[in-house]
Regions:
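N-terminal membrane-anchoring/stem segments of glycan-assembly enzymes
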Residues: 1-58
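Internal catalytic domains of large membrane-associated glycosyltransferases
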Residues: 46-183
Length: 183
């Protein structure tokens, strides 16, 4: 028994030395990155990019869809939708909010926030929630695909968004511009 304990203590010490070595390598790596950034800032080679005034309000190059799965998000989903509509005024934006049939508070909050804006579509899932977020997103994707088939236009970008997060006014334009450069 004493022999086994000795081997375990030796193994523990070797494992600690191994972990300490790689921790120090990671520390040196992070410290080098921080020093490089500081040197670039002090020499004026690293600058913070400034977006031009009005960036983010330009028309999109194609349609953009935002998919928002929501279950028991009545307290936040209305604010998220209202903020998104105000921050992203582009008419080629479509917001799909996925709710569940057994969550009337979230359905009501999403519908109230959408008011009469045709860019927002509240999609009520046919099964009782909660299911997985992926299941709700799949339901939203099917609704989006049905809208594409009906209208004959395809979405150039599909953005997944959380019900409680706010958007930056320039984010949609930046995504659109990056996709145009990529394609």
């Amino acid at each position: 028994m004493q022999d086994l304990l000795g081997w375990l203590m030796l193994f523990e010490r070797e494992l600690l030395a191994f972990a300490a070595f790689w921790f120090c390598v990671g520390l040196i790596d992070e410290f080098a990155i921080d020093l490089t950034w500081l040197w670039l800032r002090l020499t004026g080679r690293a600058r913070t990019a400034q977006l031009p005034v009005g960036y983010g309000a330009e028309p999109l190059s194609g349609q953009a869809a935002v998919l928002i799965p929501a279950f028991q998000e009545a307290a936040v989903v209305g604010t998220t939708i209202a903020h998104m509509l105000a921050a992203w005024p582009q008419p080629d934006l479509a917001i799909y909010v996925g709710c569940y049939r057994n969550d009337p508070a979230t359905v009501a909050a999403a519908s109230a926030a959408a008011e009469s804006d045709v860019r927002v579509r509240v999609v009520v899932h046919g099964v009782a929630g909660p299911t997985t977020k992926a299941d709700c997103l799949n339901r939203l994707y099917r609704a989006m695909a049905a809208d594409e088939a009906r209208s004959g236009r395809t979405f150039t970008s599909v953005i997944l968004h959380d019900a409680e997060d706010m958007v930056h006014p320039a984010a949609l334009q930046a995504i659109d511009a990056a996709l145009v450069l990529r394609d």
